[in-house]
Amino acid sequence: MYKVYLKPNKEESLKRFHPWVFSGAIAHFDGEPEEGEVVEIYTSKKEFIAKGHFQIGSIAVRVLTFRQEEEINADFWKRKLSIAYDMRRSIGIAGNPTNNTYRLVHGEGDNLPGLVIDIYARTAVMQAHSAGMHLDRMAIADALTEVMGSQIDNIYYKSETTLPFKADLYPENGFLKGGSTDNVAMEYGLKFHIDWLKGQKTGFFVDQRENRSLLERYAKGRSVLNMFCYTGGFSVYAMRGDAKLVHSVDSSAKSIDLTNKNIEPNFPGDTRHAAYAEDAFKYLDRMGDQYDLIVLDPPAFAKHRDALRNALQGYRKLNVKAFEKIKPGGILFTFSCSQAVSKENFRTAVFTAAAMSGRSVRILHQLTQPADHPVSIYHPEGEYLKGLVLYVE
């Protein structure tokens, strides 16, 4: 196993159990490791600190263990997945008869940086965000089969677009186990079609589950607008919450089809819902003030810090339009899923938008990701989803 030696005093974050080693902290290697190989990390004084997957790029090593004696083998993967599953079962997420849609592995939050596994009924969708996790995919799939047992029949691997561009790897999406295309899953008693083959992320935004449930509580008797609706998750919950009407908007015709496909089995023949394939900003420009509950859940405006300024301008512009159009006494659910946008950045953008609109606005809830998307206390960067529920006078 190759060794990585750090520059003097560059081990402090690792001693606080942060799971990343940046390339600028590395003094030298004792050889030439291949991308994805497990390497050992040492201080400049040749003291062992951790082991992890090596990769060319800003984040050079993603830590898998801080224990020198721990081998990265089949037992390791089984143990880590068992810990992840047991945590979710203990808090009522896994094994819930009304909800078979959840995140089993959330990267650094489960001490498995670079790995995401979502469960949709009897299918697990696995996604690698590092070369090491890609190379270990079969060992992980075998461990997943052992841990989940008869609870899953299929493991679908979806990493064609998630590996860093510098990695000299060409992953192909496809089934590692099974091959069923039965893609209906349940979330709190509601049925959803999950497009893991061609959909965004792993096919569904699992991270908004609790926020969708919260919206249901506010929907009764309200006219609801769900912008950037994608699968229509918020729309389905608004319908069950007895909204007066629900309009879903997305620039993608495919998303509109998927939204309608999710509305119909839950509310067959219900005429309260309509969906429109249209640019969000254009729709907000032309709409009247007929809505008293608006959801803004756009895709990530900033995937990297160099796009932060433009992203914040985008959030301001979007929220200004919503503040200007929402009815008095209306409720705005507004989100950012950009990791590069901090809670403070996002809140400032929304505050500025409120001030520009001249409306009186109060914060009812400050939202984040659910418990199956845990944040390691040693890796605060893992808290990526920000949301506010606002009362607009």
Region spans (language model):
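Conserved SAM-binding loop of SAM-dependent methyltransferases across substrates and taxa
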Residues: 231-243
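S-adenosyl-L-methionine
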Residues: 252-295
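Non-catalytic accessory regions of SAM-dependent methyltransferases
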Residues: 1-119
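Non-catalytic substrate-recognition/targeting regions of SAM-dependent transferases
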Residues: 105-118, 134-205, 213
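Conserved class I S-adenosyl-L-methionine
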Residues: 221-230
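Conserved SAM-binding motif I beta-strand of class I
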Residues: 245-250
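Mobile active-site "lid"/loop adjacent to the S-adenosyl-L-methionine
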Residues: 291-321
